[in-house]
Amino acid sequence: MEEKSVQPSYRNPRVRRWASYLWREAIVKSWGPIAPAFAKPNPAKWSNAQITAAWLGHSTVLINFFGINILTDPVLFPRIGIRIPFLFTIGPKRLTAPALTVDELPRIDIVLLSHAHFDHIDWRTLRHLSRRGGAKADFCPSVKVVTAPHTRDLLRWTTLRDVTELPWGKRKSFHTAAGDIDIVAVRVKHWGARMQHDNHRGYNGYLIERNGRRILFAGDTAFTDTFAQLRECGPIDLATFSIGAYNPWIASHASPEQAVQMANDAGARFIMPVHHQTFRLSFEPFREPIERFEAALQNQPERIALREIGETFVLPD
């Protein structure tokens, strides 16, 4: 049975009050400084014989999957929201800087986009990614983009042209300069509209497979029992789950405890918590998501891949 979209309705007065409060908070916070990332990854030193992943902030994860470089939901500028061309962006400002800038990224082979929300598809980052070093830099035709159904049009403002929309349950093999990789679109419980009235857009998680290893990038999701079905694909070595923005958006964002449960349902060996400590998108305190996540795994702390923005995880043999 398909998960139904859980898009909040602005006809609901509670939703309007929450949105207004968070908007005011975003404006107030915009006057404050942006804290530095906890650590700075060094992808140049990563081995192509291993699986290495670094959390760059929010849902942006840089993965070296046996030599194939994958970037999830790249958002690497100080602010998200509606961009006024050549001027500024209207929307929430980062609380913590990204661990790497666009120009500090290594060669990217594949970009995974989970859904169309402004904190997951960021035009400014994608434009810079497709023209590394600025508008006069050479076009990067080798970057492959995998995205949810009915979101391809959002990339027309970039020079990224190798775009695949992947519906739930669909598997596709991709060839890169470093070899081949399989990606499966995973059903999640969320919503895909970028604005209020384009709710036809899809929303995905992704299972990535190469050399007998599997990584799950769950994107944004509320609690759902569908991840248990992934056990049929084989063991999952690393699962990346969002753990923030659950208060009051629990209908579309899992709590830390629910994220752990879904990772357990999927049979994940290690869990990487993301989507926290970056933007003010909800009411929970800044450190609450990671503290609750650690508490949920207090008997298995060795399964926590990382905790802070900029940390790097190397998958053990």
Descriptions of predicted regions:
Residues 63, 73, 115, 122, ...:
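Divalent metal-coordination and catalytic microenvironments
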Residues 104-106, 127-141, 232-235, 262-267:
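Short, conserved loop/helix-junction motifs that constitute active-site signature segments
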